[in-house]
């Protein structure tokens, strides 16, 4: 049983049905079965009927005689009719007189079971409220006790009308007056709430319940006998269950966390397709005024035109202003915006408007529009020329075909650029384009901006050098998953999203209806025959895979290239694959390769036709001619089933009338019927510039496109088809260049071709024109591709979409894509699942500047009337490519920087490696002799304690005597286990030098000084610096001589010392030649030039250390011959 308020009927039925219903069958017509919820109340209630009848006889008298007294005991009299309204609380059972005067509401019990089919109000919309709060009835009769806000009816009149309304219940049931009144009130409420900008406040304010209870105290006492077994709160309405509805629902709804980036124009519908009126989620009607956000950021480096900053221009050249275009364009000026609009709703116009205003606001900044293909770029150029009025002289179109030198000149001279993203990133990396000059980047088909696509690289590169630029992203389908949409937002630094669907309220008047016809097909007899023969040919190879547990499928017709690739990877990673012999691995890889190549042919047979399947088998067979092909490939070709299959296919494909797929047959009929209904026959409309209608057919493979074109060409000139494919060349099919693509699009618009058979190249963005019929020859599991295909029609007039699907996988893919699209649209519209980059969206405009909209018709310059694309002209000799230029970001530190500075760590001071100069020793003052010698007491103590070996023997320890054995001390004595130490050798060398000194040493020394002074000039002699090679060798000679002496063997040392002792004194003199060659030092010369005999002799250290400065390098050892 349903009421006008489906939400609350069950609640009141449960409370009242359990307590006050004796015989539910009396509530409705005897022919009508009782409701299921009341059926359980029939038993166990007859005992109380007698007691209740005495109280309810007056109620039965109000009937027309057809109803018995027991009918007043039915549930209807005590159901919602007895439920008080939320505005007051009152007892339900009163005495008979008062009950007769106060007729309450009732539950509508239809006599016919199908009465619900005529009720279109199944779920009334509600103001926002939390789900846990119970809501009262949506519509009630006016309360006679309290005046309403809208209609102030006197109480007696209301009571009288209600008495009359309650007088004849059977008439009310038959004529459904209550239901009509409810429907009219619901429609009136719907219109009122639709016109309100905010949720309506309840019409009546519930007064205090105490006065009402006081006024009816006698009635409560009279009915106590009926309420003894009923709880006090049994008949409480939702007012007692929940707070008053006026203030509570609004704050409760706002307490939920919702995104501030909620887009406009998104409406929520119920399960029955009705609109859920939540004013907070609805877009504001009409045009809105947005201002740039106030941000604290450094001033922009772009030179701004202060005179133009006060306004932003909205072109009105196209006629009527669309509110959604106005609002989106205004928001796109001040935020990094992602615009998701269905195809044909003016994304190009929005982009042209934003480009025009940034062109006005800046003096020399550059604006870049990027699109994946050249046809999409050319399409935007026409919009900027014809709508926005951007001068052609400031515009250029750059692609990879232009030489780098020409592109460099264009970057210096122009301000607006239309190009592909690959060309833009190349110019940025080579320094041809200055990233600091770019102020706006418009990205078309923005759903591609994921991963490492060129769109993402462009934005990242610009962000390194420029923090003051705007991004506008345009797409019809942002993505198929939450992750893909978030990747687009992250890759382009998006801060706001504006999304519209075809059900959005503000675009409904601009969207034409699209009639979608889905046709499913089964395999034909020819296809079943081909599948059986192909399965027999492939079964042996499949069994070999299954025997090694490399593949689990049994049906060869279920093979797919992706499934075989995954199975190969899993087998190679398994233990059996890793431990298998090399020959087994080669065998498995060969079988997987052969089956994967034939899996594509199986897909062609299933979904595209027999002719593409036959072409694929011919190509597969050609690889086995001669010595080509592997063992398993030749095994398939030589199989009897395969040969039989080819014998069947060859005559079929040679027949020009053969149609190898049921979808192709139906496609031919659909296209023919469409053109015949449009009145385009063989001789019709030949004088018109444009045909009456156009058709576009989407296929997945080029083979299918060629087959469809071949079939449709039989019906020329009514059907004039042409293939529309991409640039890359494939086997048996040459690609189309971008110029060829543009030429085909222009001929399609003019009417040279009225049917285009396109692959995926025709899905995205192309303004191909007014297409009245879209035929999807195969389905796509991607919702992006599906929606792109369907968006080609229904732009300016109603369109039709025909989907041709095979039962099974293809049909499931379509359902999956459709559901995925609807779910993603809701997620994107809510905005709660995504993270936006508001910090990456700069204000750019100076603080305090708030541009005002200026709607006006733009004057189109005469130069824009030229139809050619603004490509740079080719020259006989292109300019030389400029050298690479490295642009630096602002506030960059040039020069070399240490790694410790970049890492932020402190740099350790490295000590200076230069040796400190040894200070000159100061002469020590010689102490007195008495201070050095021992005193008599100390001498006595030395002799007593240290010199005496013991008291028994007179053995005294004496000092070492250097004169006891003078000859033996000049040479080291023989040793056995312990060798002489360094001190012993130094002592021996010292004694040897002392022994070499003769009594005439002083005389010889004075003679040398005299000769030296006589041979030198009178000027003061300065010690020369050792700067020559010979000087270095002479200085190192003495050092090496001493090392050689110290490194001699013990026997050799003794022999040398013995010879020195036996040498006469005269032979120990230094040779005169060496004395004259070696320089004298300052300590060896006199300052006043006198050479008398009483001069001071140099000290011993000066004599021994002849070299003041020791060279760092060692010279060769030179042994002087004593005979020289």
From Swiss-Prot:
InterPro entries: FANCM/Mph1-like_ID, FANCM_DEXDc, Helicase/UvrB_N, Helicase_ATP-bd, Helicase_C-like, P-loop_NTPase, UIM_dom. This is ATP-dependent DNA helicase mph1. Residues 7-17, 169-178, 226-236 have a biased composition (Acidic residues). Belongs to the DEAD box helicase family. DEAH subfamily. FANCM sub-subfamily. A motif (DEAH box) lies at residues 444-447. One of its GO terms (cellular component) is nucleus. ATP binds at residues 341-348. Its EC number is 3.6.4.12. It is an enzyme of class 3 (hydrolase).
